[in-house]
Amino acid sequence: MAINAQEISALIKQQIENFKPNFDVTETGVVTYIGDGIARAHGLENVMSGELLNFENGSYGMAQNLESTDVGIIILGDFTDIREGDTIRRTGKIMEVPVGESLIGRVVDPLGRPVDGLGEIHTDKTRPVEAPAPGVMQRKSVSEPLQTGLKAIDALVPIGRGQRELIIGDRQTGKTTIAIDTILNQKDQDMICIYVAIGQKESTVRTQVETLRQYGALDYTIVVTASASQPSPLLFLAPYAGVAMAEEFMYQGKHVLIVYDDLSKQAVAYRELLLLLRRPPGREAFPGDVFYLHSRLLERSAKVSDELGGGSITALPFIETQAGDISAYIATNVISITDGQIFLGDGLFNAGIRPAIDAGSSVSRVGGSAQIKAMKKVAGTLRIDLASYRELEAFTKFGSDLDAATQAKLNRGRRTVEVLKQPVHKPLPVEKQVTILYALTHGFLDTVPVDDIVRFEEEFHAFFDAQHPEILETIRDTKDLPEEAVLDAAITEFLNQSSFQ
């Protein structure tokens, strides 16, 4: 076979023209310092703020400080295997977490990895932990109620879907109990719940998960946990991971309740990280952008417009106070960001008034527009009556003689306090709340001894369930009260049959 030099040269020329170099170009740097959950690296010239970086041992970090000579990195996970001189690579991506239906019923860490021992989570969807909040024109007004099942909240400080309502109080005043009871009350309410535990003891988180499982609430709940034993970067990231998971459902038109327990510990973790990264400290040694830390998180909770699906994220952030000081730095920051706050007093808690809600210091700025008509009618004057009772109660300590009208107000106030008490993990449907509050505000309980109020309420609800379910059904379906004569007749019938007359 004759070799044609012309053909060979044409073939070589064609191969050269069609050659496409396939280089894997990755910008790398060198770790110059490692310790306390942070690292410094030199050589990453074009790294972005918040970019995910890959260490030689397979661990990941997130670029936090971009300086002229090096980059400050927070390490996501264990840093014991990382050494000075190790190579670090850019990934070109920002931090993302897995999202979707497959996370429901699972307990995960802030990176979306399962920690409940139930195997891998199979999902191919991810969302960035840092995402812009919905814009002004992408939002709708809060108009649908979120029923907590707690009389004191649904009557005095109602919460709407898409609202941010701060729960603030000292440690051991029942903050977590309110959140767990609210999650339990979302059963059959077409609501997905996300409980973010930040800096909690692992035994405490285990207890909360078992409570949710016992009452069947884990069927619609995701638990994101960054326990006290984990590195600070995970505590800092946990709330952002939780809200990223929530956004996936919100933009599908679903309603989500997210609980941050608690943001005080996130702020402390953030302060620790940025002091280690040598950011200049401000008030109480917190970095200057600690307000932005929480505002960019809580602004992602909203009720979005119908064009975006009409879904919502309702946020219940917690802040722990010291000796009831709600004027502390982080507390005032979060109060100014949220749409209201529920203040829990340790004095009330120790006096046996649980939930220990201080009606005078608690407010819901937008929840009133979401409250159902029936509750508005029966609870309209309840807050004023309660405040008036507290004021009069203070005067009675002087031992002065009281006129009949003042005595009647005190009697009604004592019964109001008793009615608003509620046992743990027993949320009450809104129609039952309305009937007992109607009986209270219309004077049907004025002759019932204060010590018998709890027994009265139990028998009252049992009577309505058995004898007048149609009244409860009317309230549930129409969101309004039936005719007063019908309710009055039913309550009078109960009193005639009971031992309370």
From Swiss-Prot:
GO terms for cellular component: plasma membrane; proton-transporting ATP synthase complex. It is a peripheral membrane protein. It is found in: Cell membrane. GO terms for molecular function: ADP binding; ATP binding; proton-transporting ATP synthase activity, rotational mechanism. ATP binds at residues 169-176. The keyword Nucleotide-binding applies. Its EC number is 7.1.2.2. It comes from the Bacteria. Gene3D superfamilies: 2.40.30.20, ATP synthase alpha/beta chain, C-terminal domain (1.20.150.20), P-loop containing nucleotide triphosphate hydrolases (3.40.50.300). It catalyses: ATP + H2O + 4 H(+)(in) = ADP + phosphate + 5 H(+)(out). Keywords: ATP synthesis, ATP-binding, Cell membrane, CF(1), Hydrogen ion transport, Ion transport, Membrane, Nucleotide-binding, Translocase, Transport. The record marks 362 as: Required for activity. It holds the Pfam family ATP-synt_ab_N. Belongs to the ATPase alpha/beta chains family. Produces ATP from ADP in the presence of a proton gradient across the membrane. The alpha chain is a regulatory subunit. F-type ATPases have 2 components, CF(1) - the catalytic core - and CF(0) - the membrane proton channel. CF(1) has five subunits: alpha(3), beta(3), gamma(1), delta(1), epsilon(1). CF(0) has three main subunits: a(1), b(2) and c(9-12). The alpha and beta chains form an alternating ring which encloses part of the gamma chain. CF(1) is attached to CF(0) by a central stalk formed by the gamma and epsilon chains, while a peripheral stalk is formed by the delta and b chains. This is ATP synthase subunit alpha. It comes from Streptococcus pneumoniae serotype 2 (strain D39 / NCTC 7466). The lineage of its organism: Bacteria, Bacillati, Bacillota, Bacilli, Lactobacillales. The gene is atpA.
